[in-house]
């Protein structure tokens, strides 16, 4: 068995339903994403259904600035929870680990959307915004720190598309997109836990005895590791908009799976005198004699502990089908709804080394299909003021048996509230507040992580993630 320390849950960030950023505009946040493919209240509709661009009769530019804050909590379900810290501390049943503050617990999400009518039938559009994102921040000493204590996922999408009116009631559209992928994960590397899992019972005690006798360096204390990955992909989207009456619109769109096949980056392990000495011991010390007996490949293990290593991954983001209904019920009230289908069953979490192709880590998740349902309304109490509200829900795509701390995906609900002020026919300002409330779920039950020594320690807890969105949107018409 290879003595491979370097993965330690490097792949466990957010590809599940909770990472898809449907909060493209302030109005969209306020209505919890209802009516996205049919309402066309602003130019962000290019992200959801390019066919609905035909609703625009003037040039429109939408600038959006949103702040998303993330709260991460962990509660231990057992005593002696997680591998001991350097000072011997472990979690206790019912102990609460919370981290809800700090500037690094928030994401800034800008967005730019443009719609330009070319003639009465053709409208082109452009957008630049975040399509997926997640931020998790746990306390440094929480029991699952070996499976990842911080993660940051951002996917930026550039869309260029058009909408074309085939008939007075039917429009079609398409866009092409370029997506830029960024991922950063931090974790604590616990050498003692990894050694105890790697060899037969007594391996750790044998190394401690050898260290006491001067035949080996001490097994190092915990240290930090970090993975940064970059990648890109192209994709496309097609949509249609049907307007059976002047009050009702039905929109639908489909986007195939996004395949990030060339993601590469760097894994860094913080090195100190202790880790350097242990790595040298693996390369040529007593372990070269005893290692084969214990099933440990010392030179290979030393290579796995190099402080800088190139890593790669191939990731498939889900395809997406969306259908929306918008109805202008009265001069003061609009009603809307959206159903979204996202298939995550081909999404896998796997990393390899660039240098030799060996597995860094494979984290089974058995992702499922996500179904989301959203309803919302616009209410105009005054001529220049419109109030927005919405509610939505979506199922989680991973179960209690495989869920991991930095992907605490579970069933969730969306709440939105906001208002738009239109001081003139050329300008609209929107303020919005939204909440994503994710059900707390069990973590630490996944026994299928391979290699076993990188699974992050024996921990069992409850992970809870909630997010809040504050958004400002400015629409200008020309």
Feature locations, PLM:
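Outer-membrane beta-barrel porins/channels
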Residues: 15-32, 36, 85-88, 106-478
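A subset of signal/propeptide-processing and intrinsically disordered low-complexity segments
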Residues: 7-8, 17, 44, 369
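Short N-terminal alpha-helical targeting/association segments
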Residues: 4-5, 41, 311
């Amino acid at each position: 068995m290879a003595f491979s320390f370097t993965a330690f849950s490097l792949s466990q960030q957010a590809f599940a339903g909770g990472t898809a950023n449907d909060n493209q505009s302030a109005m969209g946040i306020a209505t919890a994403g209802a009516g996205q493919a049919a309402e066309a209240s602003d130019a962000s509709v290019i992200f959801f259904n390019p066919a609905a661009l035909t609703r625009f009769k003037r040039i429109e530019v939408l600038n959006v600035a949103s702040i998303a804050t993330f709260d991460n909590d962990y509660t231990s379900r057992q005593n002696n929870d997680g591998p001991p810290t350097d000072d011997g501390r472990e979690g206790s049943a019912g102990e609460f680990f919370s981290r809800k503050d700090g500037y690094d617990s928030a994401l800034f999400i800008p967005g730019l959307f443009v719609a330009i009518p070319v003639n009465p039938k053709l409208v082109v559009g452009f957008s630049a915004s975040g399509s997926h994102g997640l931020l998790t921040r746990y306390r440094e000493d929480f029991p699952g720190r070996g499976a990842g204590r911080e993660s940051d996922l951002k996917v930026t999408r550039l869309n260029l598309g058009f909408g074309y009116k085939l008939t007075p009631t039917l429009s079609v559209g398409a866009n092409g997109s370029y997506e830029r992928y960024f991922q950063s994960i931090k974790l604590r590397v616990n050498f003692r836990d990894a050694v105890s899992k790697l060899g037969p019972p007594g391996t750790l005690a044998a190394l401690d005895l050898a260290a006491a006798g001067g035949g080996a360096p001490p097994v190092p204390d915990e240290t930090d590791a970090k993975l940064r990955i970059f990648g890109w992909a192209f994709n496309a989207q097609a949509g249609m908009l049907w307007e059976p009456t002047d009050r009702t619109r039905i929109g639908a769109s489909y986007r195939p799976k996004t395949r990030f096949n060339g993601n590469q980056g760097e894994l860094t392990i913080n090195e100190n005198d202790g880790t350097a000495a242990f790595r040298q011991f693996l390369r040529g010390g007593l372990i070269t004699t005893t290692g084969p007996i214990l099933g440990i490949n010392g030179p290979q293990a030393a290579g796995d502990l190099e402080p800088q290593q190139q890593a790669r991954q191939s990731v498939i983001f889900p395809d997406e089908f969306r259908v929306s209904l918008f109805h202008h019920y009265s001069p003061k009230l609009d009603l809307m709804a959206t159903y979204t289908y996202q298939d995550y069953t081909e999404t896998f979490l796997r990393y390899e080394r660039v240098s030799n192709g060996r597995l860094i880590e494979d984290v089974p998740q058995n992702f499922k299909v996500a179904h989301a349902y959203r309803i919302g309304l616009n209410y105009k109490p005054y001529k220049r003021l419109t109030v927005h509200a919405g509610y939505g829900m979506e199922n989680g795509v991973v179960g209690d048996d495989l869920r991991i701390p930095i992907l605490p995906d579970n069933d969730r609900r969306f709440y939105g509230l906001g208002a738009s002020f239109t001081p003139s026919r050329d300008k609209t300002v929107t303020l919005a507040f939204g909440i994503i409330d994710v059900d707390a779920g069990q973590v630490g039950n996944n026994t299928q992580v391979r290699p076993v020594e990188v699974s992050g320690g024996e921990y069992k807890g409850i992970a809870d993630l909630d997010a809040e969105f504050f958004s400002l949107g400015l629409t200008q018409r020309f």
